[in-house]
């Protein structure tokens, strides 16, 4: 498939690995692997809602913290995790840009935020009840340590806009186990108990 200028257009690929099936350090009583200093730092930032100052978290972790804070403040109508906990949606772009972004990011325009999502490999869903939401297989509700595996992509050569993705290839999140918040106590040492709360499989659109 070519662009209007005759350049080859890259098609969005939706290969998805269920990272929730991978035991995350510090979330189960059966996993005795000690936390690294980096992992401890991530959990500290996540638990204390550290978003600014020295040692500010990278974009994926900051987004995890943002979603947690916004939920605690009762502003899920602006931005939130979707019911399955595997993607998030921006429901009110105007309010997100003017009331949320300035608190968490240096950028002031939603287009800049979307560019960051693209640079970190987030993919936009193009169909179904979650149309317009973003996901990354290592970006899951209550699993901040997985964000360590989200790497910023280096763009080389000609920049071409990806073609629309094929709906039939997009992950079927509502057919996967729903992910609830995980209690990650400050100072957990790898012997923390998994307190994930089961989620009701309510098939509802966060964009309705």
PLM regions and their residue ranges:
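Extended low-complexity, intrinsically disordered regulatory tracts
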Residues: 1-208
